[in-house]
């Protein structure tokens, strides 16, 4: 099985905030989804099918790392974030992991 999307714009315009936003997970497709069905080098391409040069992907990864903010969690904490305003992820963790999540509108 193979998933093909796109082409998708890396940047969208958020009408609520009246500004351009990075709305894309291309870096994570390149660095994080390698398995028997996914070749990271071919995971992100230009519209003509040519792969994005690795140095550009890694430049984007470095920018994401420089701009990242870590929240030090404490028992009882709750974090609400706007998926349009912030790209979110998590760092690696040591087991056991317990997932408590809720989606709200």
Which residue ranges define each predicted feature?
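Active-site environment of non-heme Fe oxygenases that use a 2-His-1-carboxylate facial triad
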Residues: 1-78, 84-105
């Amino acid at each position: 099985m193979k998933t093909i999307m796109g082409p998708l714009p890396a940047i969208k315009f958020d009408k609520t905030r009246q500004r351009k936003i990075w709305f894309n997970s291309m870096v994570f497709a390149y660095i994080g989804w390698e398995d028997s069905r996914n070749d990271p080098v071919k995971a992100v391409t230009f519209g003509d099918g040519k792969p994005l040069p690795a140095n550009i992907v890694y430049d984007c990864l470095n920018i994401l790392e420089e701009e990242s903010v870590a929240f030090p969690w404490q028992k009882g904490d709750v974090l609400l974030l706007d998926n349009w305003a912030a790209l979110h992820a998590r760092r690696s963790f040591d087991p056991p992991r317990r997932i408590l999540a809720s989606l709200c509108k």
